[in-house]
UniProtKB/Swiss-Prot annotation:
One of its GO terms (biological process) is lipoprotein biosynthetic process. It is a multi-pass membrane protein. Keywords: Cell inner membrane, Cell membrane, Membrane, Transferase, Transmembrane, Transmembrane helix. Belongs to the Lgt family. This is Phosphatidylglycerol--prolipoprotein diacylglyceryl transferase. It comes from the Bacteria. Catalyzes the transfer of the diacylglyceryl group from phosphatidylglycerol to the sulfhydryl group of the N-terminal cysteine of a prolipoprotein, the first step in the formation of mature lipoproteins. Signal peptide: none annotated. Its EC number is 2.5.1.145. A 1,2-diacyl-sn-glycero-3-phospho-(1'-sn-glycerol) binds at R139. The keyword Cell membrane applies. It comes from Oleidesulfovibrio alaskensis (strain ATCC BAA-1058 / DSM 17464 / G20).
Amino acid sequence: MIKYPAFDPVAFTLGPLNIRWYGLMYILGFVAAWLLARSRALKTGSGWTVEQVDDLVTYSVFGVILGGRLGYTLFYETSYFLNNPLDIFKIWNGGMSFHGGLLGVIIAIWLFARHTGKSLFEVGDFTAPLVAPGLLAGRLGNFINGELWGRHTSAEWGMVFPGAGPLPRHPSQLYEAALEGVALFIILWLFSAKPRPRMAVSGMFLLLYGSFRFFVEFFREPDLHLGYLAFGWVTMGQILCLPMILGGLVLVGFAMKNEKQAALKTE
């Protein structure tokens, strides 16, 4: 068993304000996405300007925050927020949903595409590789907060988390950081470094994230108020990942089909 480091969730204070690690991780994720996007935009023939990147990141920030909070409200704590509607605005108390944030970003991308005259999937393919660093930062923030821990385990790397009882648990936040953050970024960044048919990068993101998250859910403790939703093992996270996996397969399939048709026309 490995001893949990027991971090202070407050990174530092500025007068009366407590600056928390989790909030800093969100900022770090947005800054990383912005820097990576600008590096891609500066390449010859990218079709993007740094001004467009700045606007895209601004749209995406609002999409992540609003979508993530509303998604958590609808998917995980509906009854609580119906009884306490004003608490929806208390983001500093925690409670964000990746799947809600994803929907928020998709809406933001659609609005940005309409504003700039770009196609939805042109923007989506450009954005997809930029998401993983934010996921990495967010999962590290969960680990620092000692939240969203895993199920009980007898593995040597099990940890006893504060408030999670005396038994060691999987550090599932770190599993997610490794798969949804590091592995997903490396795969998508390298995959998108070469010209790909439209929808391919977006489809790969949906397929890979959905698959990684579905797998890690087997090690992650389900939300106490939800538990398992089907067959004694299916979690809300897995249910929400299924449309991502299916959607990713469809997009990759369309991308491959369009690539073959384009190749035939040039012969």
